[in-house]
């Protein structure tokens, strides 16, 4: 696949990202369902963490319809620099200065994940090296939601596109999309049968509900 292209610009919003994919079959299910992007997890200790050989296999099998996004948590320079794709998602406690350094070192385009806090959202919206904000629950990948009603008044004031994560699943995503009209939605545990194992029927149901 071409890893140098831009993040997919969907013909109809929201963009749908399925995070924590681990197998070629997961990729096929995401592409068949109509997802736009997939998240490959490099976070130590996560049930979705990928070994280097698994990453190589997934990149080789990546459908052209999907944009791969690497998810890092406070990464070391060599790890983040080795990612061959265009986009990374920083999901740790990276400071604004660290994000600037990563952007300068790697040239990667950056999605910054933020546990919802109004002041933090406004501050990261002004960061010149962050292109997309991903607003999450208290603990990424846990399925814990945040107060969407508290975010709603902020959205119109933000300059950057916003992806909503945290507690989404096929049963809840449609209401969130109707209420917030975000650029994108992100799901991980909400489309799993067990921790770290994607349920392909739930992936299809999630994409259908998000776009419905």
Positions of predicted regions on the chain:
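Conserved N-terminal beta1-alpha1 strand-loop-helix module at the mouth
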Residues: 1-212
């Amino acid at each position: 696949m071409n890893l140098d292209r831009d993040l997919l610009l969907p013909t109809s919003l929201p963009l749908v990202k399925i995070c924590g994919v681990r197998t070629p079959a997961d990729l096929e299910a995401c592409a068949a369902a109509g997802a736009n992007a997939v998240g490959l997890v490099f976070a130590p200790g996560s049930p979705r963490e990928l070994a280097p050989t698994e990453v190589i296999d997934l990149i080789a099998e990546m459908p052209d319809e999907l944009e791969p996004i690497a998810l890092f948590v406070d990464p070391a320079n060599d790890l983040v620099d080795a990612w061959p794709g265009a986009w990374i998602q920083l999901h740790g406690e990276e400071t604004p200065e660290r994000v600037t350094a990563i952007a300068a070192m790697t040239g990667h385009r950056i999605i910054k994940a933020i546990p919802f806090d109004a002041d933090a959202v406004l501050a990261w919206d002004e960061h010149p090296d962050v292109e997309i904000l991903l607003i999450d629950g208290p603990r990424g990948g846990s399925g814990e939601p945040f107060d969407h009603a508290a975010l709603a008044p902020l959205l119109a004031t933000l300059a950057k596109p916003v992806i909503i994560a945290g507690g989404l699943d096929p049963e809840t995503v449609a209401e969130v999309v109707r209420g917030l009209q975000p650029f994108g939605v992100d799901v991980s545990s909400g489309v799993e049968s067990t921790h770290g194992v994607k349920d392909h029927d739930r992936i299809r149901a999630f994409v259908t509900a998000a776009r419905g």
